[in-house]
Design a protein with these regions (language model features):
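Short, charged helix-capping/linker segments at alpha-helix termini
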Residues: 2-3, 16-25, 35-54, 170, ...
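Internal acidic/polar
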Residues: 4-5, 94-124
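Sigma70-family region 2
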Residues: 16-17, 40-45, 54-71, 90-92
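Amphipathic, Lys/Arg- and hydrophobic-enriched alpha-helical face
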Residues: 27-45, 62, 138, 183, ...
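Short, Lys/Arg-enriched C-terminal cap helix and immediately downstream tail that follows
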Residues: 38, 89-92, 141, 146, ...
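Structural recognition of an alpha-helix C-terminal capping motif at a helix-to-coil junction
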Residues: 50-57, 70-82
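Arg/Lys-rich amphipathic alpha helix in sigma70-family domain 2
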Residues: 61-68, 78-99, 127
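Helix-turn-helix DNA-binding module
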Residues: 132-172
């Protein structure tokens, strides 16, 4: 505990001991992060919602055997990533181009970009246009690069954690993130 707030790992251990409120707190803390990661890699909200349920059921099933070897976030996003990959393989959606204007509530990147102390309507509108361009550019990334980028940007994972989540080497994760950033820079330069 730090400053009276349980770490995610401590909450998971409490949940393993039967504390349902600890699970509810973990869900509250990580629901949007996991949902956004899945939604940005899938075609529709229904599939995302279904996978969300599967991920959190998996968390509940694995609670008794949970060992805080890695950060909880890394472990959780590994569960989400594995279910995502299984779904993509089963449905052959490797070339997915998601819809930005799907009315989703999980536009964290847009919110962060648009909310950067923009108070003037013109500045806010321009910022929202830039954010929409970023999301459109993210959609154009190959699946492996998009996943690496989103795990870093949304999941706040390190390269080592991205490698762990995606079951790749550190160098592969590093390359995917580097190529993703390079392509995003190129695509966004074309936008400007």
């Amino acid at each position: 505990m730090t400053d009276g707030v349980d770490t995610d790992e401590a909450l998971m251990l409490r949940f393993a001991g039967g504390d349902v409120q600890a699970f509810e707190e973990l869900y509250r803390r990580h629901e949007l992060r996991v949902w956004r990661y899945l939604q940005r890699n899938l075609d529709n909200r229904a599939t995302t919602d279904e996978l969300m349920q599967e991920v959190w059921f998996a968390v509940a099933r694995a609670a008794r055997g949970y060992r805080p070897i890695a950060r909880f976030t890394t472990w959780l996003l590994t569960l989400a990533h594995n279910r995502l990959v299984d779904t993509l393989r089963a449905t052959r959606h490797h070339e997915r181009l998601p819809t930005v204007a799907d009315g989703s509530d999980g536009l964290s990147l847009v919110e962060q970009l648009a909310a950067d102390s923009q108070t003037e309507p013109l500045e806010r509108a321009q910022s929202q246009q830039h954010a929409a361009a970023l999301l459109a550019a993210i959609e154009q990334l190959p699946p492996e690069q998009r996943q690496a980028f989103l795990l870093h940007a949304e999941g706040e994972l390190t390269l080592a954690e991205i490698a762990q989540v995606t079951s790749t080497s550190f160098e592969t994760a590093k390359s995917r993130l580097r190529y993703a950033r390079s392509k995003l820079r190129r695509l966004l330069r074309e936008y400007a």
